[in-house]
C-alpha cells in the first residue's frame, strides 16, 4: 500500500451548499459558526437533516463547537444559550476516557484547548456518552457508536484549530458582547500552551479507524 492522501472538500452550508450525495465523502466535519443552532436561519434545518442522514448511514461525523451543538441537537439533544455568558480563552477540560479507542490521554486526563462559546449542550442524544467536562461547561464533548460498537461521532466543544493570534483578533472583534473584564482575562490565558497537536492526532485516528471499520474509506 502506498501513502494515503486526505482530500478536503468545503461546503458552505450557510449558502445552501451541501454534498449532492451523502456518501460523497468518507466523513464530515461540522465546524464552528457565529450562529446558534436554535436560531432561525434558512440553512439550519437542512443542516440538521443532513446530519441525521449521515448518522443514519454510519458516516463518521466530527463536531467542533457549533458542530458539537448541531450534532447534539440534530440527534435529539438540547442546546441553550448559557445564562452565565461566554466561555473564552484557554481552558482545562477533564476527559473521562480516551476520545477514540487506544488514544493517549495526558496522565492527569486534563486537556487544554481554546474555547469560544456562549451556547452549551444541556441534554445528550439518546445513546451518546459524555466524553469531557470543565468547570464552565458540563458537556465539553461526547461520542456515539453504532450498535456493534463502531464509533461514528466525535464532538468537542473546544477549538483545536485556533491559535493565540487568531483568538486575540476574534476576542477584539466580540469584546462588546463578551465584556471587557472577561475579554481581558481570556487574553491572559492565550500565552498558555494548548494540547491542539494531541487533539489533531485523535481526529486523524477517529476518521481513519471509523472509516476503515465501516468500509467507507477509499
State where each predicted segment sits:
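Short, flexible loop segments at the rims of nucleotide/cofactor-binding pockets, characterized by
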Residues: 5-9, 38-40, 90-92, 108-110, ...
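Amide-donor transfer/coupling interface in amidating biosynthetic enzymes
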Residues: 12, 95-218
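Cysteine-nucleophile active-site neighborhood
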Residues: 25, 31-99
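N-terminal beta1-alpha1 cap of cysteine-dependent amidohydrolase-like domains
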Residues: 1-57, 180-218
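Hydrophobic anchor at the start of a short beta-strand
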Residues: 8, 61, 153
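Flexible, glycine-rich phosphate/dinucleotide-binding loops
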Residues: 17, 37, 70, 139, ...
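Short, glycine/charged-enriched secondary-structure capping and boundary segments
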Residues: 23-25, 42-45, 75-79, 127-129, ...
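Short glycine-/acidic-enriched loop or helix-start segments at secondary-structure transitions
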Residues: 20, 39-40, 72-74, 125, ...
